[in-house]
Amino acid sequence: MSYQENNAMPSIMDALVPMVVEQTSRGERSYDIYSRLLKERVIFLTGQVEDHMANLVVAQLLFLESENPDKDIFLYINSPGGSVTAGMSIYDTMQFIKPNVSTVCMGQACSMGAFLLAGGAPGKRYVLPNSRVMIHQPLGGFQGQASDIQIHAQEILTIKKKLNTLLAEHTGQPLEVIEQDTDRDNFMSADDAVKYGLVDAVLNKRD
């Protein structure tokens, strides 16, 4: 995950999005596939975590809470990670709203994606069998005066400590273990992610 902000537009917005047509008492109504799934309380977090994508996810979480504060929300994650600040806006909203947010990893949940996966409601965090999960420490690159570089270096150390502390809470691992295991890129299979405490179960088929 990157301490620096990234404002790249998500590629999913540039792709051709399928439409779904439904028959209603007033005739036909069409939705793009993501809007239709949103009606079923399904949110997709795909691609790099950046400000634009985070704002969309946060808006959907808040909307679904207003629709029904007592019904679970399902957050499907396929992400290589991205901006810490963007990711934390999603994480804080997940913890803030009343509905439980069930997280599901499909494909990969790396860096900030893994952090958000682990931040789902206890007992409702899942991974598909051939997905991978990766945790590591925040990344940062700075230019400028030495005093400014020192300020940013201290800030990234503060963020690292905060993320490790939260990850320890969500996984049940000791903080010292988290600090050691996030020192470098640490890839896990679906089963390994369950053993580590990042998720609660591997989903092979729907019940």
Curated annotation (Swiss-Prot):
It is an enzyme of class 3 (hydrolase). Its main location: cytoplasm. GO terms for biological process: protein quality control for misfolded or incompletely synthesized proteins. The active site is at residues 111, 136. The keyword Protease applies. It is found in: Cytoplasm. GO terms for molecular function: ATP-dependent peptidase activity; ATPase binding; serine-type endopeptidase activity. Pfam families: CLP_protease. Its EC number is 3.4.21.92. It catalyses: Hydrolysis of proteins to small peptides in the presence of ATP and magnesium. alpha-casein is the usual test substrate. In the absence of ATP, only oligopeptides shorter than five residues are hydrolyzed (such as succinyl-Leu-Tyr-|-NHMec, and Leu-Tyr-Leu-|-Tyr-Trp, in which cleavage of the -Tyr-|-Leu- and -Tyr-|-Trp bonds also occurs). Keywords: Cytoplasm, Hydrolase, Protease, Serine protease. GO terms for cellular component: cytoplasm; endopeptidase Clp complex. PROSITE patterns: CLP_PROTEASE_HIS, CLP_PROTEASE_SER. It comes from the Bacteria. Belongs to the peptidase S14 family. Fourteen ClpP subunits assemble into 2 heptameric rings which stack back to back to give a disk-like structure with a central cavity, resembling the structure of eukaryotic proteasomes. PANTHER family: ATP-DEPENDENT CLP PROTEASE PROTEOLYTIC SUBUNIT. Cleaves peptides in various proteins in a process that requires ATP hydrolysis. Has a chymotrypsin-like activity. Plays a major role in the degradation of misfolded proteins. This is ATP-dependent Clp protease proteolytic subunit. It comes from Aliivibrio fischeri (strain ATCC 700601 / ES114) (Vibrio fischeri).
